[in-house]
């Protein structure tokens, strides 16, 4: 059934929809299956996403028609489809009237993903009007709060030097805590890897006790504050809260040095909101493990990593992993920097829409995946600043002289970039950085030809 007479209004102007302030706008790349028209399929998509189905129903009234989602722009050659969703469509909490991201996803990326006339459809961006944006929690903490704990300026405090304890599974509690202590002697921040939790060989309570002690010892040794991101991911709300409360109690006076990591993609918006609301004084670390199943450029359905990141700020993530923008081992390229800008800036331009965040706190980009001291300068050149949390697993513990030296090499690399000094030149007077060249010779040969002669390495 062709529903374009009801669910398509190509006379509507995007600027007018934004000025009106009552529509969420979504931009998709959509291709109909063979034999279906573009506008016809787009209208069916909008109907299925809002007030319609595949037939007209007798219960529809004038009010219902007033909240139809409407296709307002199409470009069949580029496969671009834009839909305007009235804000009234989205579910709100009965306890406080707040917005819920699961409702946004249910409508904009729900049943429409399985429609028989759609070859593929992927959301590439969305715009949130002020009246709807104000209903989301947004972050309560971000990198500025970490800088404060670390004793740095709360504006432009610079890179937080971090790691992921490797191997990601298989370490008993004491070796895990020992690795934390080793890194903290040179670095700032350690995160649980996403599967680390309460395995039988590493009970959470025993591990956390030893990590809290390692933090105290490292702080005493260095005279510097240290940070730990503890995984509280669970299926059950009460389990997440129990883990969080135990961790804070165990760290005691260092409770404000603790972030909570949640695997936000695999557990969904409910887990992120649980952590955000139950622990508003902790940095909420959104890990996105599994997201590539829908966000990868190879996937033609779902939504992009840009969309995932933008949603995370609405939900209240203090920080989210944003990949390495083509400078590490993960999928991505240099243009991904717009993802970071959308997370951190008061207003930012995305692929399709300009978003004003109306004072909502920024979400911090967390950089991880194959990074080391040699790759950081190129990454910072592309991004334009170093105000990120950077977590290197192999880039720290793959250093020939161990985790402490690896941490120091990462910091030295950032210092060199901020000073505008060539990395090879800086390495001549900084041993840990110089040894990073020997630790990662393939990267060194590719990125810094002639380094062996300059550093006197055979």
From Swiss-Prot:
Q: Which cofactor does it need?
A: Mg(2+)
Provide the alphabetized UniProt keywords.
Answer: Calvin cycle, Carbon dioxide fixation, Lyase, Magnesium, Metal-binding, Monooxygenase, Oxidoreductase, Photosynthesis
- Cysteine pairs forming cystine bridges in this chain are none
Q: Does the keyword Lyase apply?
A: yes
> What is the active site of this protein?
166, 287
Modification sites for N6-carboxylysine: 191
Membrane-spanning intervals of the chain? none
- Give an example GO biological process: reductive pentose-phosphate cycle
As one GO molecular function, the record gives: ribulose-bisphosphate carboxylase activity
Q: Which residues bind Mg(2+)?
A: 191, 193-194
Note, other: The basic functional RuBisCO is composed of a large chain homodimer in a 'head-to-tail' conformation. In contrast to form I RuBisCO, the form II RuBisCO are composed solely of large subunits.
Which named protein is this?
Ribulose bisphosphate carboxylase
What's the name of its gene?
Answer: cbbM
């Amino acid at each position: 059934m062709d529903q374009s007479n009801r669910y398509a209004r190509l006379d509507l102007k995007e600027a007018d929809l934004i000025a009106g302030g009552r529509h969420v706008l979504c931009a998709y790349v959509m291709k109909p299956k063979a034999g279906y028209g573009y506008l016809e399929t787009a209208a069916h998509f909008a109907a299925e996403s809002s007030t319609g189905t595949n037939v007209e129903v007798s219960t529809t009234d004038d009010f219902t028609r007033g909240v139809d989602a409407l296709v307002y722009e199409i470009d069949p050659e580029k496969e671009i489809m834009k839909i305007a969703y009235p804000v009234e469509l989205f579910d709100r909490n009965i306890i406080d009237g707040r917005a819920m991201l699961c409702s946004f996803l249910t409508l904009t990326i729900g049943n429409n993903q399985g429609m028989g006339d759609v070859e593929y459809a992927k959301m590439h961006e969305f715009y949130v009007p002020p009246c709807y944006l104000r209903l989301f929690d947004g972050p309560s903490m971000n990198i500025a709060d970490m800088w404060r704990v670390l004793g740095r300026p709360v504006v432009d405090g610079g890179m937080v030097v971090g790691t992921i304890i490797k191997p990601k599974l298989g370490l008993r509690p004491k070796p895990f805590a020992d690795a934390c202590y080793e890194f903290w002697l040179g670095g700032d921040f350690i995160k649980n890897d996403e599967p680390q939790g309460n395995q039988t060989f590493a009970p959470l309570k025993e591990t956390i006790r030893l990590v809290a002690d390692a933090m105290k010892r490292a702080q005493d040794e260095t005279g510097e504050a240290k940070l730990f991101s503890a995984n509280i991911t669970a299926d059950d709300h009460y389990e997440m809260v129990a883990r969080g409360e135990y961790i804070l109690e165990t760290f005691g006076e260092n409770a404000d040095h603790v972030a909570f990591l949640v695997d936000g993609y695999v557990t969904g918006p409910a887990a992120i909101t649980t952590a955000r609301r139950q622990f508003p004084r902790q940095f909420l670390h959104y890990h996105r493990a599994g997201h590539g199943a829908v966000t990868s450029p190879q996937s033609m359905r779902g939504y992009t990593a840009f969309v995932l990141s933008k949603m995370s700020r609405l939900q209240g993530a203090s920080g989210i992993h944003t990949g390495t923008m083509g400078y590490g081992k993960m999928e991505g390229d240099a243009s991904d920097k717009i993802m970071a800008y959308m997370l951190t800036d008061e207003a930012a331009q995305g692929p399709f829409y300009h978003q004003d965040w109306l004072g909502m706190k920024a979400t911090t980009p967390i950089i991880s995946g194959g990074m080391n001291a040699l790759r950081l300068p190129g990454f910072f050149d592309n991004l334009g600043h170093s105000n990120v949390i950077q977590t290197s697993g192999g880039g720290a513990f793959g250093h020939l002289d161990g985790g402490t030296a690896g941490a120091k090499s990462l910091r030295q690399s950032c210092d060199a970039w901020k000073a505008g000094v060539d990395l090879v030149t800086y390495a001549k007077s900084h041993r840990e950085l110089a040894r990073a060249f020997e630790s990662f010779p393939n990267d060194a040969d590719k990125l810094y030809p002639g380094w062996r002669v300059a550093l006197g390495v055979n």
